[in-house]
Amino acid sequence: LRASQPVKIMENGDMFVYKETVNKHDYILVADVAKGRGQDYSTFSLIDISTRPFEQVAVYRNNTISPLLFPNIIYKYANVYNKAYCIIESNDQGSVVCNGLYYDLEYENVHVESAIKANAVGIEINRKSKRLGCSALKDLMENNKIKVVDEQTILEISTFEAKGQTFEASTGNHDDLVMNLVLFGYFVSSAYFANLTDINIKDMIFKQKLKAIEEDIVPFGFIDDGSEQIEKLQNEESEDPMRRQWQISYDREL
């Protein structure tokens, strides 16, 4: 992983832009929500899914913003990036942000898990979905399917570790930006993403691994039993007029 320098720093140093919006490109905004009390950070990452590999193009990180105000920041930059599709972690304070963005600000391009169930805006992260997201993110990174350029995100990835049955930041570190990518990994490996974009991540990774295996296989050798050389000599003899005459005379003597 290699960090890049942002082309713009906005929102009083909380918003880092690495690439400007590209016309007709599709973007996904993934957000992790904190309480805004100076401890954990409310974050989001904007990811361009029209490029190969997918590319992180902007990051927001703030540990004092209220969940009541965070939807306004998301709304602002989701619109800037071609009405980005928003995937928000809905646990605890996350539901406040989900509902604020979807209902109060009437931003429709938000992931909704169920059209029937109440409070279904966003994605609820539990132990199972977190494990699946971590596994999917690992596959994306190992197979170069996502380009991470933000320095703080890379730092958090380096201190993200397994603890028991889950994954989290090592003692004294944060994982809020990593959780953006975990949420992204969980979503892009789902059937919903495949239907939404016609991009099947699992199939792409499987084909890449299969190709790598095929390239590593040593080709089977050929056994030279001399048959090719014998056939060549026979052809040469049949084309030699002296050889044909000798054969005829030999047959007559018999």
Task: List where the protein language model places each region.
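Phosphate-backbone recognition surface of nucleic-acid-processing proteins
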Residues: E124-I125
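RNase H-like, metal-dependent nuclease domains and their acidic two-metal-ion catalytic environment used
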Residues: L1-A115, V121, R131, S135, ...
